[in-house]
């Protein structure tokens, strides 16, 4: 149970559009593809860590104490998984877009996967550069299958430590018991993405000033324990449980005291993901 100073990673909201597609057909690929991603390329891949701590005064956003602990923990964890880690600090929204564009244009053909971690303030659908918001969808679109061909069919993981709104979770007491590939196979451009959000849609995300955020602490801990034993979704389920059961906010302000948090995983992965082979 955490009892140090806790903070949140919050800010503004955006509309989104719903499109309806009429008609469909069944497609038989003619081949039973491997059930897990090929992870034995010469390189595991790049892991970008965007760590935004200090924000322009015009944004009205506070400094994110504890985020450097997260960045260091993530660097150690993903280097241990053989990723090429690139730490980027205090990027403006323009810097972030330029970085994503640049990395997406690299040749990833000898890399097994791609990881991007964003530590910042946020709200539903947006994260904050040091000078203002940028849509998360705009950042991830650079890595779609039709734009970044050398990552097509490979896992692209986006890990987001940021608020997704201003709701607070008070918690509730429980009463419970104890490849072979086909040359011309077509896949959706949004396939093979996974988004690991620190909190559920609409909610605050908590961060400890000394130990870092609840989510990143838990993610790194579970990866170090299970990355060479379990499939990634199973690891993330353990992360969810750890955050949900082992953390609670402590604040002198009763509005923010004794609050809970649950991470949210959105997966468009099409195969199982193991960090070992």
From Swiss-Prot:
UniProt keyword list: Acetylation, Apoptosis, Cytoplasm, Hydrolase, Phosphoprotein, Protease, S-nitrosylation, Thiol protease, Ubl conjugation, Zymogen
Active site feature: 121, 163
Primary role: Thiol protease that acts as a major effector caspase involved in the execution phase of apoptosis. Following cleavage and activation by initiator caspases (CASP8, CASP9 and/or CASP10), mediates execution of apoptosis by catalyzing cleavage of many proteins. At the onset of apoptosis, it proteolytically cleaves poly(ADP-ribose) polymerase PARP1 at a '216-Asp-|-Gly-217' bond. Cleaves and activates sterol regulatory element binding proteins (SREBPs) between the basic helix-loop-helix leucine zipper domain and the membrane attachment domain.
Name listed for the protein in its UniProt record: Caspase-3
Organism: Mus musculus
Residue ranges listed under propeptide: 1-9, 10-28
Protein EC: 3.4.22.56
Regulation of this protein's activity per its record: Inhibited by BIRC6; following inhibition of BIRC6-caspase binding by DIABLO/SMAC, BIRC6 is subjected to caspase cleavage, leading to an increase in active caspases.
The family this protein is said to belong to: Belongs to the peptidase C14A family.
PTM characteristics: Cleavage by granzyme B, caspase-6, caspase-8 and caspase-10 generates the two active subunits. Additional processing of the propeptides is likely due to the autocatalytic activity of the activated protease. Active heterodimers between the small subunit of caspase-7 protease and the large subunit of caspase-3 also occur and vice versa.
Record PTM N-acetylmethionine, positions in chain: 1
Tissue: Highest expression in spleen, lung, liver, kidney and heart. Lower expression in brain, skeletal muscle and testis.
Taxonomy, superkingdom: Eukaryota
Traits of the deletion mutant: Lethality; the majority of mice on the 129/Svj background die in utero or within weeks of birth because of many extra cells within the brains of these animals. Defects are caused by impaired apoptosis. Mice lacking Casp3 on the C57BL/6J background are viable. Mice lacking Casp3 and Casp7 on the C57BL/6J background die immediately after birth because of defective heart development. This suggests that Casp7 can partially rescue Casp3 in certain conditions.
Chain positions with S-nitrosocysteine modification: 163
Gene Ontology cellular component terms for the protein in this record: cytoplasm; cytosol; death-inducing signaling complex; glutamatergic synapse; neuronal cell body; nucleus; postsynaptic density
GO biological process: anterior neural tube closure; apoptotic process; axonal fasciculation; B cell homeostasis; cell fate commitment; cellular response to staurosporine; DNA damage response; epithelial cell apoptotic process
Reaction catalysed by this enzyme: Strict requirement for an Asp residue at positions P1 and P4. It has a preferred cleavage sequence of Asp-Xaa-Xaa-Asp-|- with a hydrophobic amino-acid residue at P2 and a hydrophilic amino-acid residue at P3, although Val or Ala are also accepted at this position
Top EC class, one word: hydrolase
MF GO annotations: aspartic-type endopeptidase activity; cyclin-dependent protein serine/threonine kinase inhibitor activity; cysteine-type endopeptidase activity; cysteine-type peptidase activity; death receptor binding; endopeptidase activity; peptidase activity; phospholipase A2 activator activity
Chain positions with N6-acetyllysine modification: 11
Main location: cytoplasm
Residue numbers bearing the Phosphoserine modification: 26
Location in the cell: Cytoplasm
Subunit relationships: Heterotetramer that consists of two anti-parallel arranged heterodimers, each one formed by a 17 kDa (p17) and a 12 kDa (p12) subunit. Interacts with BIRC6/bruce.
């Amino acid at each position: 149970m955490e009892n140090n100073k806790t903070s949140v990673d919050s800010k503004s909201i955006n509309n989104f559009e719903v499109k309806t597609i009429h008609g469909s057909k069944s497609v038989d690929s003619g081949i039973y593809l491997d059930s897990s991603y090929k992870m034995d390329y010469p390189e595991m891949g790049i892991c970008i860590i965007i760590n935004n701590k200090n924000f322009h005064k015009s944004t009205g956003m506070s400094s994110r104490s504890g985020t450097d602990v997260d960045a260091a923990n993530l660097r150690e964890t993903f280097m241990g998984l053989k990723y090429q880690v690139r730490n980027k600090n205090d990027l403006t929204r323009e810097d972030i877009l330029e970085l994503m564009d640049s990395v997406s244009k690299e040749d990833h053909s000898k890399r097994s996967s791609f990881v991007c971690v964003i530590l910042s303030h946020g709200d539903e659908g947006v994260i904050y550069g040091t000078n203002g918001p940028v849509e998360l969808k705009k950042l991830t679109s650079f890595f779609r299958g039709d734009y970044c061909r050398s990552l097509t069919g490979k896992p692209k993981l986006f890990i987001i430590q940021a608020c997704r709104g201003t709701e607070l979770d008070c918690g509730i007491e429980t009463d419970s018991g104890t490849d072979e590939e086909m040359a011309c196979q077509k896949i959706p451009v949004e396939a093979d993405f996974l988004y690991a959000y620190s909190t559920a849609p609409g909610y605050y995300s908590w961060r400890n000033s000394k130990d870092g955020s609840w989510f990143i602490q838990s993610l790194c801990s579970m990866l170090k324990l299970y990355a060479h034993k379990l499939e990634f979704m199973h690891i993330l389920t353990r992360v969810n449980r750890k955050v949900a059961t082992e953390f609670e906010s402590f604040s002198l302000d009763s509005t923010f005291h004794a609050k809970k948090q649950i991470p949210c995983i959105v997966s468009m992965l099409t195969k199982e993901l193991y960090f070992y082979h």
